[in-house]
């Protein structure tokens, strides 16, 4: 029996497992021939792109209802070590015991995490990096009306005006206005523009949305210090606030440190066109752990759901093909598209690495809802449809927006 072990139960991990099983079934093989195992600390696949929304406990899917029906074995445990020489992974189960899991091929799909700062008062920071973090923020916001009145009770400061910072800052306007009439949201960015990594294309739409929503933007400054009721910025400004959300900076999962391979500035593993980790036999990487090149566009893909899904599908197919002595397929993602939520102001959709705006406001918001609430969810209790959507060349659907904007494949 050959063994595929997938570390991580997010988008890349789930679709790696499904694609490996799809090839197994297409070749008429069983679990006794090719075993597929996913090891993940939690029981759920977290829909991480939605964690800026209210009620984040809804943003999860039981892994056993997705992968169980297709015969994927699941181990609930926190991975604490990877030995690529012995081809084993060590995971601590919930009862405190350690499981040693062997593999013939490994897919590291353990994702990424926010880089929290070493600042005075950092324990007062919130984040939406994990389901637990988003739930903590959500609970905190709901309790604000019960707190003692003060100048910063309904003021939120968001640090970092990148993709995540923009989504949570604009969403907080609506979430806070459900609690009080007089609210304030301040967006802090150390660089001189909002959405610095998004470029010029969507910036006019972003700036208009921030202005329309009344979000105060502080550029060229950083967070210096915080307490439970205020923050101090690098220019000396003190802002009374009860809520500070940190979104500035991401890095690949620390599990990449167990893999003796080249890594980029985000800690992602250097992979070849088949998502094999260069220089490390029998190890593949997918999703936010992989610095994968889009050959058609000549760019290393983003740490994003949009790229994690296809990477998982290609990696899962390739590890199975590798064990079956079949040809591997080169990773080829769909053309790059972004869809940025802007809270009550709508959204903006861009295409290409120049990120030219294609849709804005509420037409774009309709697409964002479709993506977040339908397309990125795996089929539950439906093995046939899951496998139909698996495989390296399974495409996302076409979107037909209401209005005059051309349809956009994402």
Predicted regions mapped to residue ranges:
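Internal hydrophobic alpha-helix adjacent to the cofactor/substrate pocket in enzyme cavities
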Residues: 17, 306-333
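C-terminal auxiliary extensions adjacent to catalytic cores
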Residues: 344-410
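Beta1-alpha1 glycine-rich phosphate/pyrophosphate-binding loop at the start
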Residues: 1-76, 167-198, 245, 408-410
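Short glycine-rich anion-binding loops that position phosphate/pyrophosphate groups of nucleotides
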Residues: 12, 111-114, 250-251, 345
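FAD-binding core/adjacent interface of flavoenzyme oxidoreductases
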Residues: 72-157, 245
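Rossmann-like NAD(P)H-binding beta-loop-alpha module
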Residues: 138-182
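FAD-site-proximal beta/loop scaffold in flavoenzymes
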Residues: 123-150, 238-243, 247-310
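A Rossmann-like FAD-binding core segment of flavoenzymes
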Residues: 35, 74-88, 101, 174-273, ...
């Amino acid at each position: 029996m050959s063994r595929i072990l997938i570390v991580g139960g997010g988008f890349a991990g789930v679709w790696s497992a499904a694609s490996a099983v799809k090839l197994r079934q297409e070749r008429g093989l069983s679990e006794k021939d090719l075993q597929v195992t996913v090891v993940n600390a939690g029981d759920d696949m977290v829909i991480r792109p939605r964690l800026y929304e209210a009620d984040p406990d809804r943003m999860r899917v039981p892994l056993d209802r997705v992968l169980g029906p297709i015969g994927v074995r699941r181990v609930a445990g926190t991975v604490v070590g990877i030995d690529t020489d012995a081809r084993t992974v060590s995971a601590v189960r919930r009862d405190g015991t350690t499981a040693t899991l062997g593999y013939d091929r490994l897919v590291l799909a353990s994702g990424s995490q926010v880089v929290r700062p070493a600042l005075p008062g950092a324990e007062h920071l919130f984040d939406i990096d994990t389901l637990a973090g988003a739930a903590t923020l959500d609970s905190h916001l709901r309790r604000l009306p019960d707190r003692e009145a003060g100048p910063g009770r309904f003021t939120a400061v968001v640090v970092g005006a990148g993709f995540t910072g923009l989504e949570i800052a604009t969403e907080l306007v609506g979430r806070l206005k459900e609690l009080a009439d007089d609210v304030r949201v301040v967006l802090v960015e150390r660089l001189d523009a909002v959405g610095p990594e998004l470029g010029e294309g969507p910036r006019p739409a972003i700036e208009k949305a921030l202005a329309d929503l009344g979000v105060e933007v502080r550029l060229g400054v950083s967070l210096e210090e915080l307490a439970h009721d205020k923050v101090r910025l690098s220019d000396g400004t003190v802002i009374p606030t009860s809520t500070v959300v940190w979104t500035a900076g991401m890095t690949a999962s620390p599990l990449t440190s167990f893999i003796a391979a080249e890594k980029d500035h985000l800690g992602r593993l250097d992979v070849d066109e088949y998502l094999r980790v260069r220089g490390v036999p029998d190890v593949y990487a997918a999703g936010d752990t992989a610095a994968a090149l889009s050959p058609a566009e000549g760019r290393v893909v983003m740490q994003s759901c949009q790229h994690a899904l296809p990477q998982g599908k290609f990696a899962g197919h390739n590890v199975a093909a590798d064990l079956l002595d079949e040809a591997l397929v080169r990773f080829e993602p769909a053309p790059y598209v972004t869809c940025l939520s802007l809270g009550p102001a709508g959204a903006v959709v861009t295409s290409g690495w120049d990120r030219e705006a294609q849709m804005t406001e509420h037409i774009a918001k309709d697409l964002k809802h479709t993506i977040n609430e339908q397309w990125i969810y795996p089929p539950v209790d439906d093995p046939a449809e899951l496998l139909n959507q698996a495989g390296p060349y399974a495409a996302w659907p076409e979107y037909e927006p209401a209005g005059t904007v051309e349809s956009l494949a994402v």
